[in-house]
Amino acid sequence: GIRLFLLSLQTAGTIAAQSTSLSQILGSAGIEPIPAMGYLLVVGGLALAMMAGLHVRAAEMMILSYDLFPVAELAASDTITPWGVRQVAGAFGLAFTLSAPFAIVSVIYNLTLGVINRAMPQMMVVFVGAPVITGAGIALLLVLAPIILQVWIEALTLFMTNPFGGP
Protein backbone atom coordinates (compact mmCIF):
# COMPACT_ATOMS: atom_id res chain seq x y z
CA GLY A 1 0.00 0.00 0.00
CA ILE A 2 2.50 2.63 1.11
CA ARG A 3 5.00 1.63 -1.53
CA LEU A 4 2.36 2.18 -4.21
CA PHE A 5 2.04 5.78 -3.04
CA LEU A 6 5.75 6.31 -3.74
CA LEU A 7 5.36 4.61 -7.10
CA SER A 8 2.46 6.95 -7.87
CA LEU A 9 4.76 9.94 -7.28
CA GLN A 10 7.41 8.38 -9.55
CA THR A 11 4.81 7.67 -12.21
CA ALA A 12 3.40 11.19 -11.92
CA GLY A 13 6.89 12.61 -12.36
CA THR A 14 7.49 10.39 -15.38
CA ILE A 15 4.19 11.36 -17.02
CA ALA A 16 4.86 15.05 -16.34
CA ALA A 17 8.42 14.85 -17.67
CA GLN A 18 7.43 13.00 -20.82
CA SER A 19 4.56 15.40 -21.44
CA THR A 20 6.85 18.41 -21.25
CA SER A 21 9.89 16.94 -23.06
CA LEU A 22 11.97 16.85 -19.88
CA SER A 23 12.21 13.09 -19.50
CA GLN A 24 15.89 12.73 -20.34
CA ILE A 25 17.24 15.77 -18.54
CA LEU A 26 19.85 14.53 -16.05
CA GLY A 27 18.89 10.95 -16.87
CA SER A 28 21.34 8.32 -15.67
CA ALA A 29 22.58 5.28 -17.54
CA GLY A 30 20.81 2.97 -15.09
CA ILE A 31 18.34 0.27 -15.96
CA GLU A 32 15.26 2.39 -15.31
CA PRO A 33 16.26 6.04 -15.04
CA ILE A 34 13.61 8.15 -13.38
CA PRO A 35 13.28 11.68 -14.78
CA ALA A 36 14.48 14.55 -12.61
CA MET A 37 10.86 15.59 -12.00
CA GLY A 38 10.16 12.17 -10.52
CA TYR A 39 13.17 12.38 -8.21
CA LEU A 40 12.13 15.83 -7.07
CA LEU A 41 8.59 14.71 -6.28
CA VAL A 42 9.68 11.50 -4.53
CA VAL A 43 12.26 13.23 -2.33
CA GLY A 44 9.77 15.97 -1.48
CA GLY A 45 7.06 13.40 -0.78
CA LEU A 46 9.33 11.34 1.49
CA ALA A 47 10.37 14.42 3.44
CA LEU A 48 6.74 15.47 3.80
CA ALA A 49 5.71 11.96 4.86
CA MET A 50 8.40 11.82 7.54
CA MET A 51 7.29 15.19 8.88
CA ALA A 52 3.71 13.88 8.95
CA GLY A 53 4.76 10.89 11.07
CA LEU A 54 4.84 8.13 8.45
CA HIS A 55 7.46 6.18 10.36
CA VAL A 56 5.27 6.03 13.47
CA ARG A 57 2.14 5.10 11.50
CA ALA A 58 4.04 2.43 9.54
CA ALA A 59 5.26 0.80 12.75
CA GLU A 60 1.73 0.98 14.16
CA MET A 61 0.34 -0.64 11.00
CA MET A 62 2.88 -3.48 11.21
CA ILE A 63 1.92 -4.18 14.81
CA LEU A 64 -1.81 -4.07 14.06
CA SER A 65 -1.39 -6.28 10.99
CA TYR A 66 -1.01 -9.29 13.30
CA ASP A 67 -4.67 -8.81 14.28
CA LEU A 68 -5.75 -9.09 10.64
CA PHE A 69 -3.24 -11.76 9.62
CA PRO A 70 -2.40 -13.99 12.60
CA VAL A 71 0.89 -15.84 12.61
CA ALA A 72 0.84 -19.23 10.84
CA GLU A 73 -2.43 -18.49 9.02
CA LEU A 74 -2.62 -17.79 5.32
CA ALA A 75 -4.58 -14.79 4.12
CA ALA A 76 -7.61 -15.56 1.98
CA SER A 77 -6.71 -14.78 -1.61
CA ASP A 78 -10.31 -14.05 -2.56
CA THR A 79 -10.29 -11.04 -0.21
CA ILE A 80 -6.70 -9.89 -0.71
CA THR A 81 -6.76 -9.92 -4.53
CA PRO A 82 -9.54 -7.34 -5.03
CA TRP A 83 -7.90 -5.12 -2.43
CA GLY A 84 -4.56 -5.32 -4.24
CA VAL A 85 -6.13 -4.58 -7.61
CA ARG A 86 -7.95 -1.58 -6.11
CA GLN A 87 -4.68 -0.31 -4.65
CA VAL A 88 -2.78 -0.58 -7.95
CA ALA A 89 -5.62 1.06 -9.90
CA GLY A 90 -5.87 3.79 -7.27
CA ALA A 91 -2.12 4.43 -7.41
CA PHE A 92 -2.16 4.84 -11.17
CA GLY A 93 -5.26 7.03 -10.97
CA LEU A 94 -3.53 9.19 -8.37
CA ALA A 95 -0.42 9.43 -10.56
CA PHE A 96 -2.42 10.60 -13.55
CA THR A 97 -4.40 13.03 -11.40
CA LEU A 98 -1.18 14.54 -10.07
CA SER A 99 0.32 14.89 -13.54
CA ALA A 100 -2.86 15.99 -15.36
CA PRO A 101 -1.88 19.70 -15.60
CA PHE A 102 1.30 18.72 -17.44
CA ALA A 103 -0.63 16.49 -19.86
CA ILE A 104 -3.15 19.28 -20.53
CA VAL A 105 -0.37 21.79 -21.24
CA SER A 106 1.25 19.23 -23.54
CA VAL A 107 -1.95 18.79 -25.55
CA ILE A 108 -2.39 22.56 -25.86
CA TYR A 109 1.26 22.90 -26.89
CA ASN A 110 0.98 20.23 -29.57
CA LEU A 111 -2.26 21.67 -30.94
CA THR A 112 -0.68 25.12 -31.09
CA LEU A 113 2.37 23.76 -32.92
CA GLY A 114 0.07 22.02 -35.38
CA VAL A 115 -1.80 25.24 -36.11
CA ILE A 116 1.42 27.21 -36.50
CA ASN A 117 2.90 24.53 -38.75
CA ARG A 118 -0.25 24.55 -40.89
CA ALA A 119 -0.18 28.35 -41.17
CA MET A 120 3.55 28.60 -41.92
CA PRO A 121 4.84 25.26 -43.24
CA GLN A 122 8.31 26.58 -44.00
CA MET A 123 8.92 27.61 -40.38
CA MET A 124 10.71 25.10 -38.15
CA VAL A 125 8.21 25.20 -35.29
CA VAL A 126 10.17 22.71 -33.21
CA PHE A 127 13.00 25.21 -32.78
CA VAL A 128 10.53 27.77 -31.49
CA GLY A 129 8.39 25.36 -29.51
CA ALA A 130 11.03 23.27 -27.73
CA PRO A 131 12.26 26.07 -25.44
CA VAL A 132 8.65 27.08 -24.76
CA ILE A 133 7.53 23.63 -23.58
CA THR A 134 10.74 23.15 -21.58
CA GLY A 135 10.30 26.48 -19.82
CA ALA A 136 6.60 25.86 -19.30
CA GLY A 137 7.32 22.44 -17.80
CA ILE A 138 9.84 23.84 -15.34
CA ALA A 139 7.54 26.76 -14.46
CA LEU A 140 4.60 24.40 -13.96
CA LEU A 141 6.69 22.18 -11.71
CA LEU A 142 7.75 25.22 -9.69
CA VAL A 143 4.14 26.33 -9.22
CA LEU A 144 2.44 22.94 -8.90
CA ALA A 145 4.91 20.88 -6.84
CA PRO A 146 3.53 22.12 -3.49
CA ILE A 147 -0.04 21.42 -4.62
CA ILE A 148 0.90 17.99 -5.99
CA LEU A 149 2.62 17.06 -2.73
CA GLN A 150 -0.31 18.35 -0.68
CA VAL A 151 -2.79 16.20 -2.63
CA TRP A 152 -0.43 13.23 -2.32
CA ILE A 153 0.07 13.54 1.44
CA GLU A 154 -3.69 13.88 1.96
CA ALA A 155 -4.25 10.66 0.01
CA LEU A 156 -1.47 8.92 1.96
CA THR A 157 -2.90 10.09 5.29
CA LEU A 158 -6.34 8.85 4.28
CA PHE A 159 -4.83 5.47 3.38
CA MET A 160 -2.88 5.27 6.63
CA THR A 161 -6.05 6.01 8.59
CA ASN A 162 -7.93 3.11 6.99
CA PRO A 163 -5.70 0.93 4.77
CA PHE A 164 -8.41 -1.58 3.87
CA GLY A 165 -10.99 1.03 2.92
CA GLY A 166 -13.79 -0.36 5.06
CA PRO A 167 -16.52 1.72 6.68
Locations of regions flagged by a protein language model:
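Hydrophobic alpha-helical segments and their helix-loop boundaries in membrane
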Residues: 1-167
